[in-house]
Amino acid sequence: MTGFKQHKGIVVPLDSANVDTDAIIPKQFLQKVNRIGFGKHLFHDWRFLDDAGQQPNPEFVLNQPQFAGASILLARENFGCGSSREHAPWALADYGFKTIIAPSFADIFYGNAINNGMVPVRLKEEEVDALFQLVAAQPGIEIEVDLEANQVRADSLCFGFEIDEFRRYCLLNGLDAIGLTLQHEAAISAFEAKQPSWI
């Protein structure tokens, strides 16, 4: 997992509350157990007018040219609600999103996003409103998420955010559960060497 310190990118506004995991990645695309290849199905039922995913919906924000290459998703409250499928953050990451900004996230989605190297940023509702207004006035604007400073910076706006220190440490250093365990590889090997061979 790659460490996250700062990221500056185009922000795309998804002006919907309670976006659930079935909207993020519909159930018919959950047939794989690796993380690659889900991005093309992200928001499938909103991005496309047909089941085969061949006819883009020109009204959907991700299909609008000013947001091409967006890597920051701006959303409303309770993002990622619904089922606990880890495929949801996989799809967002595979599409190219590095961070998601919203007033609140579903708890399981929040943890899954962090475990997959994405930074879910919780801002106050009025701060999210200000970002939506900024993007409406300047479509395609880039904003910066700084995990070292715990700040979101955009134009003249600067908002602080909070994140659990352990999770912040993991994101900054690119550590998932396996990476954390491997930090103690020498101690684990030393412990195992002292155990009877039949254990």
UniProtKB/Swiss-Prot annotation:
Its EC number is 4.2.1.33. GO terms for biological process: L-leucine biosynthetic process. It catalyses: (2R,3S)-3-isopropylmalate = (2S)-2-isopropylmalate. One of its GO terms (cellular component) is 3-isopropylmalate dehydratase complex. One of its GO terms (molecular function) is 3-isopropylmalate dehydratase activity. It is an enzyme of class 4 (lyase). Pathway: Amino-acid biosynthesis; L-leucine biosynthesis; L-leucine from 3-methyl-2-oxobutanoate: step 2/4. The keyword Lipid metabolism does not apply. SUPFAM superfamilies: LeuD/IlvD-like. It comes from the Bacteria. Keywords: Amino-acid biosynthesis, Branched-chain amino acid biosynthesis, Leucine biosynthesis, Lyase. The keyword Ribosomal protein does not apply. Catalyzes the isomerization between 2-isopropylmalate and 3-isopropylmalate, via the formation of 2-isopropylmaleate. Heterodimer of LeuC and LeuD. Belongs to the LeuD family. LeuD type 1 subfamily. This is 3-isopropylmalate dehydratase small subunit.
